[in-house]
Amino acid sequence: MGVVPFSTSPPYLSVVFTQEDFKPDGSAVLIMNPDVRQLDDPKSCNATYDLRVGDKFKDHRNDTIQALNEGECIELLPGNAVIIQTEEEVRFPRRLFGQILPRVSLLALGIANTPSKIDPGYSGRLLITTFNHGKRTEKLRRKDGFCSLHLLPVEDGVIPFNAPGKQHTGLPRSSPLQRWRDWLEVRQIWLTFGVFALTMASVILSVVAILR
């Protein structure tokens, strides 16, 4: 089964931008709020489309949804994860299936997302869990491409997705003990550095005392 290229013109039309042009039984996905530059660039590989960081995200330790305005960024601490809502809203026909994979350029920085799927018939924005497996804090700006979407053809007999699209909802409120543990996890690097600094200071003072 081959990958369907992202094309906005016949005879390989696979992407449309308006509800009027979308056909539920067709073979073109509807992408609203698209990055047109990706789709119009003749030198860009059109086997994938890079989904972008949208205007909402949620830290996996936090029970509130956080807004992300133009020019702002998400700071991903080492070992941390966030659920990012995509800038794009999609609507899939019954003839296409979507697969979401990490971007190689971000993997080199330790940033990876959970591989996800988009069923035929799905309509809505996408929520992508993204991790920082690296050792440094990394930033993802609003409208940065952070994961890659692949299109795959679907054979006859498929039962389309028939449920509301995804949206951010608050997580259950954690206990005081869990919040304390989360606080320690987030600041683990700084706490480790602080202990190391105090230890070194103690050693230096001891050496100075001996030399005197």
Predicted regions and their residues:
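DUTPase catalytic domain/fold
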Residues: M1-R212
